[in-house]
Amino acid sequence: NTPNTLMTRTFSKIYGLASLRVGWAFGPRSMIETLERLRSPFNVNGAAIAVAAAAMRDVAHTDAARGHNNRWMGVAVQRLRALGLGVTGESGNFVLPEFPDTPGKSAADTDAFLQSKGVIVRRVDNYGLPNHLRITLGTDEEMESVLNALTQFMGGSDG
């Protein structure tokens, strides 16, 4: 009974279906009716809807993805803090380590080093976080790669 609250969710994170551009909204009828009037006709195709519905029924996959995410969140936070980095954003599917504002060790320098190693992370300067990088939790191999590269860059061993 909260007339101005709308909950929205995507299928991009836990379900791994970002390319389908599908999601859902739950809220008061008046807000849903407004969304219906504003959205483009045929804004989600039938195949995307079918895949999203199947993903919602695949509880085993969702549980496995959540477990993988939780495990790597803990590992990533621990290893980043061991490198002396502050960590923000310990929920969701990414972490935001804060890098020193020191020439040679800044977020920009770190990003350039990671790119040279084939590791892509996201700069977040445009969100007012010039000393942070967004690291999305990935596969075991991807996580080992980014964490080992960061360890190497920050002056520790690579592994």
Question: What are these model-derived regions, one by one?
Answer:
Residues N4-R81, L85-T88:
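PLP-dependent aminotransferase class I/II
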Residues P28, R57, P100-D101, G138:
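Residue-level recognition of strand-loop junctions within catalytic nucleotide-signaling folds
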Residues N1, V75, R79-L83, F113, ...:
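Alpha-helical structural signal in soluble globular domains
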Residues R9-T10, P97-E98, R122-V124:
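Thr-Gly-centered strand-to-loop micro-motif
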Residues K105, F113-K117, R122, N126-G159:
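PLP-dependent enzyme catalytic core of the Aspartate aminotransferase-like
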